[in-house]
Structure formats: structure tokens, C-alpha cells
């Protein structure tokens, strides 16, 4: 397994069985039980929407704008309209599927990024603080989230972090 290089490709139809997806629910709009009922026609009321507090606390980085639909086409926030922000991954469907409110993009359960973060957290707890292996694991996720450029809003983890600070960083990711 490996991370998909470009954050915008994590949820594309081309990578739904890609190197990052370890376990997912298959989505098929011909079977209503597996169609995720995307939020496009429902302004955030599909099967997957984002909690407003989570959206507000999300670091300002490329990943935020690749994953979350915060405004509608006219620029109003979904909260202003009385709705929840949408999970933007469905905008990577074909225009026909998106316009019809359906999707063939699988719903991820565990991605390789999740495993890297679980390892970093477990390693931190087992060692009483971050190790180089744990720092390297979380930094793979952070680097990809920031499109591989330094971002003061989401800095890399380091060995100098305390066990508590490193744990908070992993949980934030």
C-alpha cells in the first residue's frame, strides 16, 4: 500500500481500488443499498456530510478544499442556508453521475493514510514519545495534505514534540 500522490486523486473513480484504499464499501447506483445518495441535490443532506465544528477546526490547506464543500455555487456557505457542508469527494464523479445525485465512488472504511496515523499513535504510546518511525509516518500524511509544501497552518511533526503534543497532532490529522 501507499498514499495516492495528489490529494485531489484520493477519491477519484480511477483510484477507488488504488494503492491507498485498503477496505471500502463498493458503491453502485444500480443497487439502492450501496448508492451513497450524494448531497449535490440535497445541499449537504446526503449520507455523508461534515460536522460544522470539524470544518471550522480543519487547517487551511489543500486537503480541506479537496475534501469539503463549504459553499454552494453562488458562494453562500451551507450553514448560512441552514444545511451542513458536503463531503466533496463526490465532485470527482462523472458530471452525469454528480448531476443525478448518484456515485460509483466507493465509501472508504480504512485507507493507508489511516494505518500510518494508527501506527504513529501506537508508536508514540509504546515509546513514551515520538520516534523517527512515528514522525515519518504522520509526516507522509501531512506532506500530502499540504501538496508537499511547507504550511504554517499544518506544520510537520518532529521528534522534539512531547508525547501529549504528538498525540494531539496525530488526532488532528
Regions picked out by a protein language model, each given a short descriptive name:
Residues 18-19, 26-54:
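His/Glu-based metal-binding/catalytic segments typifying zinc-dependent metallopeptidases
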Residues 1-30, 62-173:
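Acidic/polar-rich alpha-helix caps and helix-coil junctions
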Amino acid at each position: 500500500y501507499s498514499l495516492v500522490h495528489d490529494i485531489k486523486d484520493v477519491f477519484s473513480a480511477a483510484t477507488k481500488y488504488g494503492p491507498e484504499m485498503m477496505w471500502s464499501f463498493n458503491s453502485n447506483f444500480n443497487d439502492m443499498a450501496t448508492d451513497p445518495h450524494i448531497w449535490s441535490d440535497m445541499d449537504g443532506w446526503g449520507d455523508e456530510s461534515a460536522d460544522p465544528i470539524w470544518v471550522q477546526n480543519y487547517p487551511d490547506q489543500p486537503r480541506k478544499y479537496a475534501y469539503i464543500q463549504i459553499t454552494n455555487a453562488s458562494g453562500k456557505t451551507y450553514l448560512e442556508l441552514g444545511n451542513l457542508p458536503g463531503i466533496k469527494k463526490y465532485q470527482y464523479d462523472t458530471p452525469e453521475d454528480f448531476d443525478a445525485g448518484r456515485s460509483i465512488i466507493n465509501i472508504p472504511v480504512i485507507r493507508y493514510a489511516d494505518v500510518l496515523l494508527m501506527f504513529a499513535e501506537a508508536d508514540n504510546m509504546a515509546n513514551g514519545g515520538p520516534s523517527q518511525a512515528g514522525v515519518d509516518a504522520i509526516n507522509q500524511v501531512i506532506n500530502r495534505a499540504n501538496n508537499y509544501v511547507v504550511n504554517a497552518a499544518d506544520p510537520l511533526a518532529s521528534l522534539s514534540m512531547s508525547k501529549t503534543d504528538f498525540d494531539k497532532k496525530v488526532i488532528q490529522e
